[in-house]
Amino acid sequence: MPNDNRLAPAALAAQAAALPAAWRHVLEQPAVARAFASVLGHVEQRLAEGAVVYPATPFRALDQLAPADVRVVILGQDPYHGPGQAQGLAFSVPDDCKCPPSLRNIFNEIAVDYPRPTRHDLSAWTRQGVLLLNTSLTVEDGQPGSHAKRGWETVTDALIAEVARDPSPKVFLLWGAHAQAKQALVPADAGHLVLAANHPSPLSARRPPVPFVGCGHFRQTNAWLQQRGQKPVDWSGEQNNASRQGEFAL
């Protein structure tokens, strides 16, 4: 049986209210509050009508990280729309789920320079300051993009802008046109690094202008962070294995 990752009625509002203050104040900005109220109304209406909505924890990407804790931002589009998949972290699925094609290509790219990840759950990245944020935080079963343009983009744009305003150095990994459209939210003089490539989906990963395959983003991210006195990210997700830490430095 797949994990039960269905959103429960009233859970979205409760989770928003429980967010850390650094994120909650973003949702309280007037324009963002109006957009979130619109999203919330639509989600609750669809749940009342019997729709299955994923994931159970839409705000999970924000739970363990304040804006100042974020070192890398990876943007997705909307959650996986199959049962048991979406976890509230972009690209991540439970370990017992089959590895989705885009995540497989991400792992292939990591394996060029580092040990290949063995876990499909990317929580270990989050614990190292990697924000895995979808631009739409809910989706209906079997209907990709079903909650896009319902107000989520206003909410997540404000969250991205809040991260970009924080002065600590950050890397923004923008894969595909949808993510790259968010580059305008990252001021050019903010001292952050923006790396862009095609989406890791098999449909686009090898296409020009900047193929995802061979982009070297994970190596470049670590090199840039280390140049600024920060620890590299253990992209293998096995940061507790001290004997392998040196493999993630350049």
Swiss-Prot record:
Entry keyword annotation includes DNA repair: yes
Reactions catalysed, semicolon-separated, are: Hydrolyzes single-stranded DNA or mismatched double-stranded DNA and polynucleotides, releasing free uracil
Q: Where is this region: Disordered?
A: 228-250
Query: What are the entry keywords?
Result: Cytoplasm, DNA damage, DNA repair, Hydrolase
Kindly identify the residues recorded as the active site: D78 (proton acceptor)
A Gene Ontology biological process noted in the UniProt record is: base-excision repair, AP site formation via deaminated base removal
Compartments in which it is found: Cytoplasm
Instruction: Cite a GO CC annotation.
Output: cytoplasm
Asked if the keyword Hydrolase belongs to this entry, the reply reads yes
NCBIfam families the UniProt entry points to: PRK05254.1-1, PRK05254.1-2, PRK05254.1-4, PRK05254.1-5, ung
Q: Which function does this protein serve?
A: Excises uracil residues from the DNA which can arise as a result of misincorporation of dUMP residues by DNA polymerase or due to deamination of cytosine.
> What is this protein's name?
Uracil-DNA glycosylase
Q: Which organism is it from?
A: Bordetella parapertussis (strain 12822 / ATCC BAA-587 / NCTC 13253)
UniProt lists the gene as ung
